[in-house]
């Protein structure tokens, strides 16, 4: 299926690895122009080499998204160069495991800023151009906003807000034909997830923990791949989903909405 993304300029935050990288690479395969925002974290050269094998038309900006004021100049530069902005994928963020009883309000607010504010600012700055192009926004969220997890108070608050903003922005921009949707991720195999699994001990202990998790995923009892999330994201960015807005799309093998006791 042709997603009609050829030449579309799409921002992707946190795009050097994990889910963001998968989305950026898939956009490149579809002929889009990925504009990747990410801090320097040691993998930028590897990412550049990998995406360069797919396309020569992409942009990379080194930015700490906690520095919210740095977003607007990048948006203006991209618009000036290409003359249009067609999509935004808000992806960057991390689960910092800040729990209720041991987290100060200052650290809570800092976490919200790091996981939420840049979602707002990037859409705020690109909004006039998305109206021009009748573009699409995809916010990457997490199942912790829907299910709770424990020990994720700040992260759950940010991801819950992202789901709320998805529907608010969909309503606010519906008359401009700008579509806004969210991808709700549950258990996805990423470098961050792999590092987390390693904290459970030796290889046998890691495998035991991983099996406990995958056994609860109804569809095929396996983790969701980055590529599966990227494919759904690209579909939502494309005109092939032209009458889809305000939706929370769970890409999770049925983890949230199906009975986890299913054999």
Predicted regions and their residues:
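Short C-terminal tail/terminal secondary-structure segment
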Residues: 147, 234, 245-263
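Conserved glycine-rich cofactor-binding loop
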Residues: 16-18
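Residue(s) in the substrate-gating loop at a strand-loop-helix junction
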Residues: 142
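C-terminal helical subdomain
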Residues: 182, 204-240, 244, 251-253
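Active-site helix of classical SDR
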Residues: 123, 158, 166
């Amino acid at each position: 299926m042709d997603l009609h993304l050829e030449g579309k300029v799409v921002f992707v935050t946190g795009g050097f690895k994990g889910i963001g990288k998968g989305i950026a690479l898939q956009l490149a395969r579809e002929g889009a122009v990925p504009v990747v925002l990410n801090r320097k974290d040691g993998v930028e050269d590897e990412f550049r080499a990998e995406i360069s094998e797919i396309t020569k038309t992409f942009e990379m900006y080194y930015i700490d998204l906690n520095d919210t004021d740095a977003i607007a100049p990048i948006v203006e530069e991209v618009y000036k160069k290409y003359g249009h902005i067609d999509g935004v994928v808000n992806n960057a963020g991390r689960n910092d495991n800040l729990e209720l009883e041991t987290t100060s309000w200052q650290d809570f607010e800092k976490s919200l800023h790091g996981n939420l504010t840049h979602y707002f600012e990037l859409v705020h700055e690109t909004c006039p151009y998305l109206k021009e192009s009748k573009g699409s926004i995809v916010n990457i969220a997490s199942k912790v906003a829907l299910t709770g997890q424990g020990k994720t108070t700040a992260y759950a608050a940010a991801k819950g807000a992202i789901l709320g903003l998805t529907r608010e922005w969909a309503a606010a921009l519906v008359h401009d034909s700008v579509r806004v949707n969210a991808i709700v991720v549950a258990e996805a195999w990423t470098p961050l997830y792999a590092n987390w699994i390693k904290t459970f001990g030796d290889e046998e202990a890691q495998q035991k923990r991983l099996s406990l998790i995958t056994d609860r995923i109804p569809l095929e009892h396996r983790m969701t791949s980055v590529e599966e999330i990227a494919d759904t994201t690209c579909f939502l960015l494309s005109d092939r989903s032209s009458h889809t807005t305000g939706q929370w799309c769970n890409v999770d093998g049925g983890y949230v909405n199906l009975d986890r006791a299913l054999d």
